Amino acid sequence: MIDRYKHQQLRIGLVSPQQISAWATKKIPNGEIVGEVTKPYTFHYKTNKPEKDGLFCERIFGPIKSGICACGNYRVIGDEKEDPKFCEQCGVEFVDSRIRRYQMGYIKLTCPVTHVWYLKRLPSYIANLLDKPLKELEGLVYCDFSFARPITKKPTFLRLRGSFEYEIQSWKYSIPLFFTTQGFDIFRNREISTGAGAIREQLADLDLRIIIENSLVEWKQLGEEGPTGNEWEDRKIVRRKDFLVRRMELAKHFIRTNIEPEWMVLCLLPVLPPELRPIIQIEGGKLMSSDINELYRRVIYRNNTLTDLLTTSRSTPGELVMCQEKLVQEAVDTLLDNGIRGQPMRDGHNKVYKSFSDVIEGKEGRFRETLLGKRVDYSGRSVIVVGPSLSLHRCGLPREIAIELFQTFVIRGLIRQHLASNIGVAKSQIREKKPIVWEILQEVMQGHPVLLNRAPTLHRLGIQSFQPILVEGRTICLHPLVCKGFNADFDGDQMAVHVPLSLEAQAEARLLMFSHMNLLSPAIGDPISVPTQDMLIGLYVLTSGTRRGICANRYNPCNRKNDKNEKLYETNYKYMKEPFFCNSYDAIGAYRQKRINLDSPLWLRWQLDQRVIASREVPIEVHYESFGNYHEIYAHYLIVRSVKKETFCIYIRTTAGHISFYREIEEAIQGFSQACSYDT
């Protein structure tokens, strides 16, 4: 369907019997209305042609071959001069055979049938609206018991007997005996109701607004009572309140979408277009049919049997009619969702039939495999690896993938620059991988974002746009900070690459979908671009350090190699002296020269105006020099003072990893501040 904004969309929900009839029926030029499937047959075994009014009828679903009717006559499609537009003998219209992909039919059910999705699936919508136990409703649907209709004010048989209680077994089994007597049809139809028809009557009598009001009043009363002191009773109250909330939400949804509750009980059963449930001829002349065809045949057989029982014989036992209605209900249940009521239906080879639910749900269903997961043009797929040198909004595309995705744009660039005379010459240059091809590819990629998608796409951050750059290898490089939005890691995960073609798609990718514009979670507002997994381990290793305490800074005669910052294995003093550095650049330079390790503790001189020591902490040790100056050594810093107790300088105890991490954070903050100043 197409909404008012011209967006194509698909909506799955309840529809009225009138809407089903409008979808499935059509009026042929002679005025006859067709669409009802009344026969369970598919193809005639002799002529190999579809049976009339069967599951593949050409009158209902359209011709198998375009412009050719069931009689074999041919008409030119779209030729207004050709008259008539349908065959008067077989009633088949001369139209395109593609109509068999979307033209539906319907089965007129003799008795109402509940939709098993709304009865058996949890939560049961029918049970929620009627506020009755699911077990009781199932017994009513499958004709295990009946209920009395509160009809007229006249003294009826059941009123004289009292209200009907199905728990009384003798009374329950005595009712069918009256049905076997001729003339009790009026009594049966007037005073009791069973099967899906009983559910339909109760749903039709519901007033959704009154349901909302009554549920709200009851919810408030339960909230005012407070805890009873009995844990079991308190749990029952909580469950009841949750149920009332679900019931109100369901009623509001029905009102908002203009859906009537009785539509959950089917009177007309839609029949899928035949091209969606085909019969294919394989080698040896054998036929391979879709399971749905067999399930449809089962429904039609049982429905026709029930029709014969009600029309051909006036003295049919009522119990037999009820059993046949139950069989029709079970056949429709199997068609919609095989196995939902217990053991699934199997064929002669003990293979479970695939019902309508099996066709559309799951990874191999119609939606995820054919509609959502189908292969599209201008897309690729590869394994992702970490790209720590990338910017947040960039991704690395392998040359092999990039040249295929942007081949059309590269061909246009070669022709525009007069480097190729036609498309064939341009493709040959691309196959030869000439240097000019990579230069044009770089220019094209600079102005064209790509979309990365990791399945399953559970929220909008599952698809984000990036600025691609060429990388060597055959894997896609990704910044590790964007992994949380994709729920991805680098243990073999794959991602799909898509190229937005239209200007609208490119604008949306640049303005809304770039990774550096999606830093917060759309669900809860928390930061989504946070370090995870590999980055957390790297930050831990970078800032862990070797915890040796201040004893390594002591001077002792046995530690002869302290000035070289080396370990001494020949004595018990195994640790080296912690070096002093005037600034962070000297410390990083010493690390790059491999004079210290990444986790080696060191003393870094800190500016006095940047750090104020106002702690009352007592120094662990005090080292005095020959001129009277002394060092106050604390757990994480060191203060150099003069004889007059003036502070010369302060050293903090850190590692080269801490310094490197601090400088990265400082540069990021400075860059952010500059960007904010430019904006203002």
From Swiss-Prot:
Any coiled-coil regions, as ranges: none
CC cofactor note: Binds 1 Mg(2+) ion per subunit.
Keywords for the protein's UniProt record, in alphabetical order: Chloroplast, DNA-directed RNA polymerase, Magnesium, Metal-binding, Nucleotidyltransferase, Plastid, Transcription, Transferase, Zinc
One Pfam family per UniProt: RNA_pol_Rpb1_1
UniProt enzyme class: transferase
InterPro entries: DNA-dir_RpoC_beta_prime (IPR045867), RNA_pol_asu (IPR000722), RNA_pol_N (IPR006592), RNA_pol_Rpb1_1 (IPR007080), RNA_pol_Rpb1_3_sf (IPR042102), RNA_pol_Rpb1_clamp_domain (IPR044893), RNApol_RpoC1 (IPR034678)
Binding residues annotated for Mg(2+), in chain numbering: 489, 491, 493
Reactions this protein catalyses: RNA(n) + a ribonucleoside 5'-triphosphate = RNA(n+1) + diphosphate
GO MF annotations in UniProt: DNA binding; DNA-directed RNA polymerase activity; magnesium ion binding; zinc ion binding
Cofactor requirement: Mg(2+); Zn(2+)
Subcellular location per the Swiss-Prot or TrEMBL entry: Plastid, Chloroplast
Source taxon at top rank: Eukaryota
Plastid found in the keyword field: yes
GO-annotated cellular components: chloroplast; DNA-directed RNA polymerase complex; mitochondrion
Entry's EC annotation: 2.7.7.6
BP-aspect Gene Ontology terms: DNA-templated transcription
Binding site for Zn(2+): 69, 71, 87, 90
PANTHER family noted in UniProt: DNA-DIRECTED RNA POLYMERASE, DNA-DIRECTED RNA POLYMERASE SUBUNIT BETA
HAMAP family associated with the record: RNApol_bact_RpoC1
Function: DNA-dependent RNA polymerase catalyzes the transcription of DNA into RNA using the four ribonucleoside triphosphates as substrates.
Subunit architecture: In plastids the minimal PEP RNA polymerase catalytic core is composed of four subunits: alpha, beta, beta', and beta''. When a (nuclear-encoded) sigma factor is associated with the core the holoenzyme is formed, which can initiate transcription.
Protein name from the UniProt record: DNA-directed RNA polymerase subunit beta'
Organism in which the protein naturally occurs: Draba nemorosa
Gene of this entry: rpoC1
